[in-house]
Amino acid sequence: MMPDITFGPKGWMPERLGDLSGKTFLITGANAGAGFQAARMLLKKNAKVVMLNRSVEKSQAAVADLKSEFGSEAEVSFIRMDLASLANVREAADQVLNSVTRIDALICNAAIAQVPTRKLTEDGFESQLGTNHYGHFLLCGLLFERIEASKGRIVVVASLGYNMGLKTIKFDDMNWEEGYGPNTAYSQSKLAQMMFAYELQDLLAVAGRTEVEVYVCHPGSSATSLISTSGSRTMRFIWWLMTKTPMVQTAEQGSYPEVMCATEETLTDQRALYGPTGRLEAVGPVGKGTLHPHAYDKTVMTRLWEVTEQETGFKWKI
């Protein structure tokens, strides 16, 4: 496949951003890494940013950093939310709906990765599936009407990991009671997130509710804190070594795809995967990359949606 050159040889760049005054962006997992850099980029253009983060201390520090960079009047705040707790996601969504009048984009950026040994969330889900997929599924559902009223977007930050592992959903053992591996479980969780996005696109199209656009992107290999926070010591060391090579880009570059998907008005193709288009699609100019068909296998997507509604106890009204 030829690299996408929609945005020229350098790909999408933040210079394309216009003034974002009056727009509100919600970002999950925005106190570090690509999520934090996305918040910076949006604030720089006068947007309002609400972070949805698990750690209060790290969020307070991130808000303080951003206000010291952009001034005390910068519109940045946080709401505490732990994606690993469905009850907590519901509380956070209530807070959002009580305090945020419009949502121009909800960027589902938070994730945990490479959890060394199998752990369960308080709801009994394998931790990566519970956090990355179920938590975001519920959050998007609870905020959907507000996003739709704002003619906003949902941006799912996926990972090239979807193309590793089983390349399908292990319906007979989604919580990995047998055969748990940090990478295979992570890959399934990211594939599930992509399938959620692509199935949502289909459901909205059938219902004629096309005000909300749903985009899927990935950061490529960016030097974010993902592996360093939840991976094993060996994985963290390997990643640290990799960050010293040209196969890894900065966290700021890693945020380009999600900011592009949240703001770029010329994007039209929603059944796509946006991200770096250079070597191995891990680095390089940002545009439309390769999307492998197992990510939108209709039978699997439809079944996953039904299972996810059952598991989360939340039924989308589309």
Task: Please name every model-derived segment.
Residues 1-106, 111-113, 118, 160-170, ...:
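NAD(P)H-dependent oxidoreductase Rossmann-fold/reductase module
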Residues 117-118, 124-126:
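Substrate-binding pocket helix/loop in short-chain dehydrogenase/reductase
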Residues 140-141, 198:
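A short, exposed helix-loop element centered on a Lys and neighboring polar residues
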Residues 147-150, 205:
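Helix-to-beta-strand junctions that scaffold the AdoMet/dcAdoMet cofactor pocket
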Residues 155-158:
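Extended catalytic-interface subdomain
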